[in-house]
C-alpha cells in the first residue's frame, strides 16, 4: 500500500518504537518515518519465525519493539505467530496489535464496490496449508456464492493453483461473472484490471496481485465492479417473492417469545421450543 494508507495508530506505534523488525522489502516504505536512533532489523523471505524470536529477545531487554507486516498484520501476517510464540514460550511480554488496511480492501476500493455483500478471503499458498484443504475452501466459497478475494495467487514455484481455482469457480459461477485484479495496490507500479471469470488469464497474475471474484449478483458499471446490497433490482425482488414464509416465521417467533412466562430458558432449549410451538400453532 501507500504511506497515505498507514493509520495514525500504526504510525504512532512505529515512531514510538526503539526497534523495528520486518521483511527487508517493507523498510523502503517507512524508513523516512522513523525517529532518529531507531534500530532496524530486516530479514529475508520465509524468516517469520526468526523475526518473532528477535522481537521477543529485544522486548526482554526492555525495549519497545514493532514488528511490521504489509496490509493488516493480523491477516496472513505476523500477528498470529507473535501470539502463538508468546503462548508457547510462556512470555509475559505485553503485545498490542494495530489493524491496517489489507490488500483486498485496497484493491476493492480501486475496483469500485465488489465486496458490498458477504465475502471470504482465500490464500492459494500451500506452504502452511495442504492443497487438499485449500481446494475444499475454494469449492465451498464458489458454491456458497461468496464474493471471493484471492491472496498469493502465484509465486515463482507455484503457478497451476490459479488455473485450478478458475476451473472450480466455473463449475459454480457463470462465465461472465465479473473479476477484478490489482497489481501492487497503492504503490507506484499499481495496475487495475477488470475482466470476466471466463476471460481471466492466470498468466497475467503475479505474486503481487490480489484477485477479486464477484458473486452471482456482481455486475460491471464502466470499469467498476458493483456487488449490490439489495436495495435495488433482482435481489430485492427475490426477497419479496420468496420471503413471505420466512417473514411469517420471524413474526411468529417474536410473538411466541414475548408470551413465554419463563424468559430464562437456555437458548438451545428455547430455539427448539419456539420451533415446536410455531409448527403446531399452539399459542
Question: Could you describe each region identified by the protein language model?
Answer:
Residues 1-95, 201, 238-271, 275:
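Class I S-adenosyl-L-methionine
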Residues 40-42, 95-97, 121, 179-181:
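Conserved beta-strand scaffold positions in the cores of enzyme catalytic domains, especially
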Residues 75-144:
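Class I SAM-dependent methyltransferase SAM-binding "motif I" and its flanking Rossmann-like core
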Residues 2, 71-76, 101-103, 155-158, ...:
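Gly/Ser/Thr-rich loops at beta-strand to alpha-helix junctions
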Residues 1-5, 128-131, 193-195:
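Short gly/ser/thr-rich secondary-structure transition/capping motifs
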Residues 64-65, 143-251, 275:
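A contiguous loop/helix-start segment that scaffolds small-molecule binding in enzyme catalytic cores
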Amino acid at each position: 500500500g501507500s504511506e497515505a494508507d498507514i493509520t495514525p495508530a500504526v504510525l504512532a506505534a512505529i515512531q514510538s518504537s526503539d526497534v523495528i523488525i520486518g521483511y527487508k522489502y517493507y523498510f523502503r516504505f517507512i524508513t523516512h518515518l522513523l525517529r532518529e536512533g531507531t534500530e532496524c532489523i530486516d530479514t529475508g523471505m520465509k524468516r517469520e519465525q526468526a523475526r518473532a524470536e528477535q522481537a521477543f529477545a529485544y522486548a526482554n531487554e526492555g525495549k519497545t519493539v514493532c514488528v511490521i507486516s504489509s496490509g493488516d498484520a493480523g491477516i496472513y501476517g505476523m500477528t498470529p505467530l507473535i501470539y502463538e510464540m508468546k503462548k508457547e514460550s510462556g512470555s509475559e511480554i505485553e503485545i498490542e496489535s494495530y489493524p491496517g488496511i489489507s490488500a483486498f480492501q485496497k484493491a476493492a476500493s480501486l475496483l469500485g464496490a465488489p465486496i458490498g455483500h458477504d465475502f471470504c478471503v482465500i490464500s492459494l499458498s500451500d506452504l502452511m496449508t495442504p492443497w487438499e484443504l485449500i481446494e475444499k475452501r475454494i469449492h465451498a466459497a464458489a458454491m456458497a456464492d461468496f464474493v471471493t478475494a484471492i491472496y498469493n495467487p502465484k509465486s515463482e514455484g507455484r503457478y497451476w493453483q490459479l488455473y485450478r481455482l478458475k476451473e472450480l469457480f466455473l463449475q459454480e459461477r457463470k462465465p461472465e461473472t465479473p473479476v477484478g485484479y490489482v497489481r501492487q495496490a497503492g504503490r507506484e507500479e499499481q495496475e487495475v484490471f477488470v475482466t470476466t471469470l471466463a476471460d481471466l488469464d492466470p498468466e497475467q497474475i503475479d505474486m503481487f496481485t490480489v484477485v477479486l471474484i464477484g458473486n452471482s449478483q456482481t455486475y460491471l458499471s464502466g470499469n467498476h465492479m458493483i456487488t449490490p446490497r439489495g436495495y435495488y433490482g433482482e435481489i430485492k425482488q427475490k426477497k419479496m417473492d420468496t420471503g413471505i414464509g420466512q417473514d411469517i416465521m420471524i413474526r411468529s417467533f417474536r410473538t411466541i417469545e414475548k408470551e413465554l412466562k419463563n424468559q430464562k430458558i437456555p437458548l438451545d432449549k428455547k430455539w427448539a421450543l419456539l420451533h415446536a410451538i410455531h409448527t403446531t400453532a399452539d399459542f
